[in-house]
Amino acid sequence: MKVSLFITCLSDVFFPQVGKSVVEIMNQCGVELDFPEGQTCCGQPAYNSGYQEDAKLAAKQMIKAFEHSEYIVTPSGSCASMVHHYYKEMFKGDSEWYEKAVHLADRTYELTDFLVNVLGKNDWKSKLVEKAVFHQSCHMSRALGIKEEPLKLLSQVEGLDIKELPYCQDCCGFGGTFAVKMSSISETMVDEKIKHIEATEANLLIGADMGCLMNIGGRLRRKNKNIQVLHVAEVLAKGLNK
């Protein structure tokens, strides 16, 4: 099986360790992984801001970059949902690119979805002794319907005590450009999220979207809270070396 890694902007620039963790996970699974260098931003910021033509240019570049990939895996539900849902919306009325967009979407998987539903991983051998909570990101849970997959994998990590996070599916306030355009509302939302995290007395927050982790993690640091923030890929990969 050959898999191409769609790294995403946030992992490339801010969370390179997440990309490295995905590579370690795929190696553990015996998957042949490549990295198409022509990949770029999925176009979501431009699309959400109303710059349709710019978003189309990004989408076309992505389609070209992964044209020959058997499977495409990304550690981001947000970017995966962009490819799955909005590429097809953008190219309605353009039969050539619409078909290419559908073909790309059919081969693109969020990481935990791929591990559970394609590779059938139900015996993940890793160990990490922490008390943790898991944050459900909006795009991943609502747009893609991926809710149980990350929890199923995390339940297999020896020593990891997952506490239930109240209102776990409530938005953290990131929302891409929303956090910039409506920063005061975003700040209120993330403070509410942190209140619920603290109520669990967990010392580790796990998520599957780096936008959420950047937003919550940044706010935790500004408030001097001693709560670590990790992507689910980092948790699964860390345990491999224990």
UniProtKB/Swiss-Prot annotation:
Gene Ontology CC entries for this record: cytosol
Recorded superkingdom: Bacteria
GO molecular function term, any single one: oxidoreductase activity
UniProt cross-references to InterPro entries, sorted A to Z: Cys_rich_dom, LutA
Cystines in this chain: none
GO biological process, one term: lactate metabolic process
Protein name: Lactate utilization protein A 2
Organism, as annotated: Bacillus cereus (strain 03BB102)
Taxonomic placement: Bacteria, Bacillati, Bacillota, Bacilli, Bacillales
